Amino acid sequence: MRKFETLLLLSPELAADAREALLGTLTGVVEREQGKMVAADHWGMRDLAYPVQKHMRGYYVRLEYLAPGEAVAEVERNIRISDGIFKFVTVKLADAVEEVA
C-alpha cells in the first residue's frame, strides 16, 4: 500500500450535502479498491488567482488515503466523470506504507 494525497477544487455552487455525497462516493471508491481513508480536510471557499469555468472562487478539499497504486486510476476516473469538480491533482506521499491496525 502507498500513501496518496488528492487535492480537489470543487464548484462554489455545490451545496454542502452535494459536496458530502461526492466525497462519500470517492471514499467508497477508495475502500472498494482495498484502500483506507486517512483524512479529509475541508479547506473551504477560497479566491482563485484566475477564473476557472467562469468562477473566481472555489471550494478546496484535501483527501489523504492508503491504497494500492492501481486504485488511484479508479479514483481519478470517478473524479473525471463527476460534475462539480473543476480541477484535481494526486501525488504519492510515501511508498510501501505499513498499515497500522
UniProtKB/Swiss-Prot annotation:
Any GO BP annotation: translation
CDD domains documented for this protein: bS6
GO molecular function, one term: structural constituent of ribosome
Pfam family, one: Ribosomal_S6
Domain of life per record: Bacteria
Disulfide bonding pattern of the chain: none
GO CC, one annotated term: cytoplasm
Keywords assigned: Ribonucleoprotein, Ribosomal protein, RNA-binding, rRNA-binding
HAMAP family in UniProt: Ribosomal_bS6 (MF_00360)
Stated role: Binds together with bS18 to 16S ribosomal RNA.
Family: Belongs to the bacterial ribosomal protein bS6 family.
Official protein name in the record: Small ribosomal subunit protein bS6
